[in-house]
């Protein structure tokens, strides 16, 4: 039986082997709002620091408030993304289970097809062997008849 490639391996095995940058990109694709919230929070902190440095306390306070709101948004995005990703993972696992069953069914059908073809080949070989035997018998019978014909011709000559 040939090796069937596994198309339903989990990503967890591959995730451990990924380099850091690839892991980061993978997770950012899984939960795109979290990096956006983090960048927005960082921007708010930077603007608040710049306003503090310039002496504009009122704008600095506004940007610090934005920082808190954006951190809250990031946290909510993180929790919501984890929940959504968890439900999608369960759906994917059930889908993967269906794919496994389908692959197993295809494998069984392929095995049955191979067995059917093997039986057909055996039947053809048996028929060919019978035909060879029959041809051999016919050849022997033909040689006997030719011998009888020669004998009869010799008798007629005498």
UniProtKB/Swiss-Prot annotation:
Keywords noted in UniProt: Coiled coil, Membrane, Mitochondrion, Transmembrane, Transmembrane helix
Membrane topology annotation: Multi-pass membrane protein
Residue ranges of coiled coil: 88-158
Source species, domain of life: Eukaryota
Pfam family for this entry, one: HIG_1_N
Keyword Transmembrane helix (UniProt): yes
InterPro entries per UniProt: Hypoxia_induced_domain (IPR007667), RCF1 (IPR050355)
PROSITE patterns linked to this entry: HIG1 (PS51503)
Annotated TM spans: 32-52, 68-88
Disordered: annotated segments: 128-158
UniProt keyword annotation of Transmembrane present: yes
GO cellular component, one term: mitochondrial membrane
GO BP: any one term: mitochondrial respirasome assembly
Assembly behavior: Associates with the respiratory chain complex III/complex IV supercomplex.
Protein name: Respiratory supercomplex factor 1, mitochondrial
Organism: Kluyveromyces lactis (strain ATCC 8585 / CBS 2359 / DSM 70799 / NBRC 1267 / NRRL Y-1140 / WM37)
Lineage: Eukaryota, Fungi, Dikarya, Ascomycota, Saccharomycotina
Gene: RCF1
């Amino acid at each position: 039986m040939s090796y069937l490639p596994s198309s339903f391996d989990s990503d967890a095995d591959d995730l451990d082997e990924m380099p850091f940058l690839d892991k980061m990109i993978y997770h950012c694709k899984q939960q795109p709002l979290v990096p956006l919230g983090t960048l927005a929070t960082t921007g708010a902190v930077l603007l608040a620091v710049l306003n503090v440095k310039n002496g504009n306390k009122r704008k600095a306070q506004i940007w610090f408030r934005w920082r808190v709101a954006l951190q809250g948004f990031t946290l909510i995005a993180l929790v919501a993304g984890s929940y959504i990703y968890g439900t999608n993972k369960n759906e994917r696992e059930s889908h993967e289970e269906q794919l496994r069953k389908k692959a197993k069914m295809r494998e069984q059908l392929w095995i049955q097809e191979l067995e059917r073809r093997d039986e057909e080949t055996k039947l053809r070989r048996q028929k060919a062997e019978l035909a060879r035997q029959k041809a051999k018998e016919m050849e022997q019978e033909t040689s006997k008849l030719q011998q009888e014909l020669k004998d009869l011709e010799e008798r007629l000559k005498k």
